[in-house]
Amino acid sequence: MNSLLIAATDTDAGKTVVTTGLVAYWQKYYPSKALGLMKLMQTGQGDREWYEGLFQGQLEMITPLQYQAPLAPPVAADLEGRDIPLGTVWQALLNLQKSQDLVLIEGLGGLGCPVTHELTLADLAAQWRLKTLLVVPVKLGAISQTVANIALAEQKKVNLGGIILNCLEPRTETEIEQLTPIDLIQSLTNCPVLGVFPFIEDRRDLDKLASVVASWPEIKLSSI
């Protein structure tokens, strides 16, 4: 299946900047191949304007479900008296997969984030057989959050492709090693750390974003 879910350990982990980097990488190194981007569902203010302004029509992007309140989807939907029709999301994904060589799916919250009253993002990733990258912010507490999210992923049988460490602020190599020690995380989770995304002040610098992703030797988007 030609799809990759970008999930995270929590909200504000940097999924959008990592996803932007993956888009920039794909467009730079695989310009002849079509790329689609899907926001699984959006609550509150979204990133659609960000992506559209940055890639200016070069990217097929869809957001099947949107809710106004910046809350967990079932809570936001309840406030509006609406349902969460996952069938609509699934059909939108199938349609995008048919027309694109690769579809990047930006998730929401952590893998334990509820997408309905019964299902979490991890449930959805497993049921829809989505290969998943886990974005981990470089900060205090990241190790325990990573272990917990991957334990949930294993319980739900999510196809985890690996971990991306993301710097939300400028970090030295020593800080990265102390806050998110790669060997320790890999030992505790049996999940590979594929790369580190450094803090980039200008998130519109697509060449720099693409070069970061290109420096991760284990990332092979063309083989998904």
Swiss-Prot record:
Q: In which pathway does it act?
A: Cofactor biosynthesis; biotin biosynthesis; biotin from 7,8-diaminononanoate: step 1/2
**Positions with a binding annotation for Mg(2+):** T16, D47, E106
GO MF terms on file? ATP binding; dethiobiotin synthase activity; magnesium ion binding
Q: Which reaction does it catalyse?
A: (7R,8S)-7,8-diammoniononanoate + CO2 + ATP = (4R,5S)-dethiobiotin + ADP + phosphate + 3 H(+); (7R,8S)-8-amino-7-(carboxyamino)nonanoate + ATP = (4R,5S)-dethiobiotin + ADP + phosphate + H(+)
Q: Does the keyword DNA-binding apply?
A: no
**Keywords from the named record:** ATP-binding, Biotin biosynthesis, Cytoplasm, Ligase, Magnesium, Metal-binding, Nucleotide-binding
Q: Which residues form the active site?
A: K39
Write down the EC number: 6.3.3.3
Could you say which residues bind substrate here? T43
One GO cellular component term of this record is: cytosol
Per the annotation, which location comes first and is thus the protein's main one? Answer: cytoplasm
Disulfide bond entries: none
Q: What residue stretch is flagged as signal peptide?
A: none
Annotated ATP binding lies at 12-17, 47, 106-109, 166-167, 198-200
Q: Which cofactor does it need?
A: Mg(2+)
Q: Which GO terms describe its biological process?
A: biotin biosynthetic process
Protein family according to the UniProt entry = Belongs to the dethiobiotin synthetase family.
Q: How does it assemble?
A: Homodimer.
Query: What is the role of the protein in this entry?
Result: Catalyzes a mechanistically unusual reaction, the ATP-dependent insertion of CO2 between the N7 and N8 nitrogen atoms of 7,8-diaminopelargonic acid (DAPA, also called 7,8-diammoniononanoate) to form a ureido ring. This cyanobacterium does not encode bioA (which catalyzes the formation of the precursor for this reaction in the cannonical pathway), instead it encodes bioU, which replaces bioA and also performs the first half of the cannonical BioD reaction. Thus in this organism BioD has a different substrate.
Protein name as it appears in the record: ATP-dependent dethiobiotin synthetase BioD
> Whose protein is this, by species?
Microcystis aeruginosa (strain NIES-843 / IAM M-2473)
Q: What is the lineage of its organism?
A: Bacteria, Bacillati, Cyanobacteriota, Cyanophyceae, Oscillatoriophycideae
